[in-house]
Amino acid sequence: MEELQDDYEDMMEENLEQEEYEDPDIPESQMEEPAAHDTEATATDYHTTSHPGTHKVYVELQELVMDEKNQELRWMEAARWVQLEENLGENGAWGRPHLSHLTFWSLLELRRVFTKGTVLLDLQETSLAGVANQLLDRFIFEDQIRPQDREELLRALLLKHSHAGELEALGGVKPAVLTRSGDPSQPLLPQHSSLETQLFCEQGDGGTEGHSPSGILEKIPPDSEATLVLVGRADFLEQPVLGFVRLQEAAELEAVELPVPIRFLFVLLGPEAPHIDYTQLGRAAATLMSERVFRIDAYMAQSRGELLHSLEGFLDCSLVLPPTDAPSEQALLSLVPVQRELLRRRYQSSPAKPDSSFYKGLDLNGGPDDPLQQTGQLFGGLVRDIRRRYPYYLSDITDAFSPQVLAAVIFIYFAALSPAITFGGLLGEKTRNQMGVSELLISTAVQGILFALLGAQPLLVVGFSGPLLVFEEAFFSFCETNGLEYIVGRVWIGFWLILLVVLVVAFEGSFLVRFISRYTQEIFSFLISLIFIYETFSKLIKIFQDHPLQKTYNYNVLMVPKPQGPLPNTALLSLVLMAGTFFFAMMLRKFKNSSYFPGKLRRVIGDFGVPISILIMVLVDFFIQDTYTQKLSVPDGFKVSNSSARGWVIHPLGLRSEFPIWMMFASALPALLVFILIFLESQITTLIVSKPERKMVKGSGFHLDLLLVVGMGGVAALFGMPWLSATTVRSVTHANALTVMGKASTPGAAAQIQEVKEQRISGLLVAVLVGLSILMEPILSRIPLAVLFGIFLYMGVTSLSGIQLFDRILLLFKPPKYHPDVPYVKRVKTWRMHLFTGIQIICLAVLWVVKSTPASLALPFVLILTVPLRRVLLPLIFRNVELQCLDADDAKATFDEEEGRDEYDEVAMPV
């Protein structure tokens, strides 16, 4: 039950994040328009803009108690609110921050006593004694108390205020009741306290034990003001009394734990009554003051009526759970979208308008800082990129002097090296070593250095990727079939690539990335994942065919240059190495976001999961000396992978025979296909890294980066090296590693970004280190290919994370009652959701068929046809609101660890 409650609190807390709702503290002009399908706001017009006189509020609830040691009455801190609620346990430790849960009767009773209570606005007092005297005088004037009760209540209000750090010295406390003589009698709480009270007074496992005042103080904004809520029982009173005081200026009354000036004071006192729990009334009042809309109304109210009006609005947007058992965790989590709708109503000040965010992708006239805005001039976008980004060049160097940058270099080096080795080994397999590990490492190093020095967004990590591997395999097969020199054909493709990118940049073609929606991205990513998984098992089957399991073997097999017959245990060991690498990498990825060990240790282990997995399985293979496994082919030093087939410079007219003239011109077609792949990956990666929530300040440059990446790839082909693209997962990981999260965040709330170390040195050093890795031939040559197959399988499986298409395919096999509460399930009929999924599956099947035929070179062209399919045909089948839900880019940037989520969940692009 505790886990269920924690999950519910996490989901509800997510709804309070400012980026999802119109926050009253943010000017309306800065907020996004509400979605078209949202219910219109209620007629009540709440304050939705910040007022110059409003502040963040720290709320403290204190109860009237008696200490066990001195038998003296005092006010004891019981709970506090800094956006979320924290309760003080009996052992003096604070419970974990959580969303406040209120009983229905406490809200009704609070409204009743508030209706009859005393309200003092803009009181000109600077001491607690002055406030208490004026409040009691008003109580008497409004006939809330008798004159003879004044002295007893004044004495009570001026009692000593104690806090969490004093609890142990007091020997504990117990609830007390104020009587006429001042002697304690019955407990403040009823003898049979409710389950609600027990729940909130318990110290949870995730408690924040040892929170010092200074520790909590740095979580509170500097200009915050405090609200003090005092609750207690006084038997001599005839009825409950409530006093609400707003001081004209916040004053240091020395009544709360923190040195925060007090602006508001709630006093709730009264006699014992059958259905009144003053602690719960105090919690309700404190929660009310911590709520954003009521807080602003409390600052701006000019009468009791305005406060009651805001209280009614608070009640209108509160949920009531009936006293029934939740049949499942899913049933409780279904409250989240209901609460989201209530929050929208409360935070919106005008009727809902059509959502413009869905059409943002088609807005070709962005703001003045929009890097995709067209200028209408040749190379106008490129010039704007240079003018926008290069003035920061000096700071790109100086900002790198930070320990965090050094840590990011080490981390990203391994993140870039592992796929470079993996793809290099597989590229050598596909091309008969005409390009392999050495070419890919050198290409990654040289292009990485140039991009780090000249790129507009130096946080992008350029590297080889799955789609490029698929193209290389298809083009190699095409050349083999037609008797063409593969490595020479790539040179002509490189020439055409340079021409294409110059034309596209000249006419500002980068704006076309706006038309590529999640629909196309997910089909692309899913296809590459399937290819990764298929190729892994295809290679494993090939090993079993070459080294079948049989009863007897010929042990006199010639081993040079490769085994000339089947060998014992080779297939089984290859299976173990592949599966072991995959499972170790998967487990370490999950371990990163688990709850074991301190967060820093988890992140270190998880971030280096792939290199650790490779190292473990290489050691396993190393210690099994009597079983053969095929190793990675790496030349010694600065040499090409196959020196008998090529050198470092490729002659454009042919190496062994004259290259056909018709193919020189026909290479424009495969060049266009390569350009499509690089354009898709690089531009979408730039969009993801440049999301506004990442709070980067130096900007990016789509045109400049595209020119560099494609241009460098075209030149690299002349030297027989692979062309590269901006890699999505590695780039997002790089940006996350350089993101500095602020410490002054609300307890229990998500950390806020303080800054991002936008600089060029980390990318530069990573590229240099990758290049130097070519000298690691003695180590690299010991890596079995089966280990790389395991990493290949890992990349295929992890690429499925965050792909909504994969989630919807799984829903095809689940009854509707087990479907999650997400927009594309809740707002779209099930059969129409499955229809959308079916259309994507058909597109995927067509792409797979194309990939499996001799026409596999045309794969990128067929892929790009899904863009007009999405933009032209699907709107004829699905309503606008359905497409918003099914094709929305709702992935959130991942900065901090969250169980079950990482960078792979943020992107819908292949690895």
Swiss-Prot record:
Keywords (A to Z) from UniProt: Acetylation, Anion exchange, Blood group antigen, Cell membrane, Disease variant, Elliptocytosis, Glycoprotein, Hereditary hemolytic anemia, Ion transport, Lipoprotein, Membrane, Palmitate, Phosphoprotein, Transmembrane, Transmembrane helix, Transport
Domain of life: Eukaryota
Organs and tissues of expression: Detected in erythrocytes (at protein level).
Enzymatic reactions: hydrogencarbonate(in) + chloride(out) = hydrogencarbonate(out) + chloride(in)
Transmembrane segments: 404-427, 436-456, 460-476, 486-506, 519-541, 571-591, 603-623, 664-684, 701-719, 720-737, 761-781, 782-800
Outcome of swapping residue 656 to H: In MO(a) antigen
Region ranges ((Microbial infection) Interaction with P.falciparum (isolate K1) FBPA): 13-31
Reported effect, residue 518 to C: In SPH4; Dresden
Subcellular location: Cell membrane; Basolateral cell membrane
Extent of Acidic residues compositional bias: 1-26
Mutation effect (residue 646 to Q): In SW(a+) antigen
Recorded consequence of changing residue 432 to W: In ELO antigen
GO biological process, one term: chloride transmembrane transport
Region named Interaction with ANK1: 176-185
Phenotype for residue 444 to N: In DRTA4; decreased expression; decreased stability; no effect on dimerization
Family: Belongs to the anion exchanger (TC 2.A.31) family.
NCBIfam families according to UniProt: ae (TIGR00834)
Record text on subunit structure and interactions: A dimer in solution, but in its membrane environment, it exists primarily as a mixture of dimers and tetramers and spans the membrane asymmetrically. Component of the ankyrin-1 complex in the erythrocyte, composed of ANK1, RHCE, RHAG, SLC4A1, EPB42, GYPA, GYPB and AQP1. Interacts with STOM; this interaction positively regulates SLC4A1 activity. Interacts with GYPA; a GYPA monomer is bound at each end of the SLC4A1 dimer forming a heterotetramer. Three SLC4A1 dimers (Band 3-I, Band 3-II and Band 3-III) participates in the ankyrin-1 complex. (Microbial infection) Interacts (via N-terminus) with P.falciparum (isolate K1) aldolase FBPA; the interaction inhibits FBPA catalytic activity.
PANTHER family for the chain: ANION EXCHANGE PROTEIN (PTHR11453), BAND 3 ANION TRANSPORT PROTEIN (PTHR11453:SF12)
Protein name: Band 3 anion transport protein
Organism: Homo sapiens (Human)
Gene: SLC4A1
